[in-house]
C-alpha cells in the first residue's frame, strides 16, 4: 500500500498521506475494541458471540476490498474522478521526482544497499514493541484493574484513540520541516519511554493507562515519518522489491514481540520483564535510525534523492 501511495503523492506530501492512511490502524483499534466487547456478548440464532464477531467484522472488510478493487486505479491518469487538469498536475509533479532516479532497480540491487537492511531492522524492532503491546495490553489491563471483558475493551481503546491526532501531527510536521529520520527516531524513543514509565508508576491504573497512551503515541507516530523517509530512499522501480523485503523482515516482529512478552512473563511471573523487553526494542529502533548518516548514493537504481541516509 505504501508503494501505491507513492504513485499518487509527492515526496513532500507523503508524511501526511501515510499518516492519514495508517491512522486507520489506531482508529480501528479504538472503535473495534469496544465493538468487539459488545459482539462477544451476543448469542443470536444459536450462534455464539465470538462467531458473530468474525462475521460482523469480517464482512465489511471484504466489501471494502471489493469497492477498492473497482473504484481505485493504479495511476492518477486512469482515475475517472479526477479532472484532466488534476491528472496532468499530479503526473507532472511525480514525473519530476522520477527524473532524479538513477539506473535500474530490482530486488538484488535493493538488497545490496546497507540502508535497506537498516530500514528493515528499525521497522522490525518497532514492530516487535508495537505488536507486543497490542497483543498483551488487554491482559495487562485486566490484571491490574480487575475489569470485565467489556470494560477492558473500553480502557484498551484509550491509548489508540489518543495516538490518532499525534500520528497526524507527526506526519504534518515531518512534511512541513522536510525532516524524516529524527521524527521517526524520536517517536521510537517516546514509545520506549512510555513503556518504561508504565512499570514505574507503582501500579496506579490511571498512570499506567497514561503511560501506555504515551507508548502508543510513539509507536503510531513512527509509521508515517518512517515510511515518508523510506519512500524517499528507493526509486519507483526498486520500491516494490525494497519495501517487500522491509515488510518481510518487519513482520517477524509480530511474532517475536508477543512471544517474547509471554515467555518472560511465564519465566518471571510478572509482566515487567516482558514490557522492559519492548522498551529495549523500541529504543534500539531509534538507535538504528540515529546511526544512519548522509552519503552520496551509488548509481544502482535505489536512490531517489541526491542525498540519502545509509548506515
Regions found by a protein language model. Name each.
Residues 1-9, 221-234:
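Intracellular juxtamembrane helix-capping segments at the cytosolic ends
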Residues 15-38, 44, 60-61, 247-257:
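Glycine-rich segments within core transmembrane alpha-helices of 12-TM secondary carriers
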Residues 40, 166-179, 265-266:
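Helix-to-loop junctions at the C-terminal end of transmembrane segments
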Residues 108-171, 223, 227, 257-258:
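Extracytoplasmic gate region of multi-pass secondary transporters
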Residues 180-229:
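C-terminal transmembrane helical hairpin of 12-TM major facilitator-type secondary transporters
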Residues 231-270, 278:
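A late C-terminal transmembrane helix in Major Facilitator Superfamily
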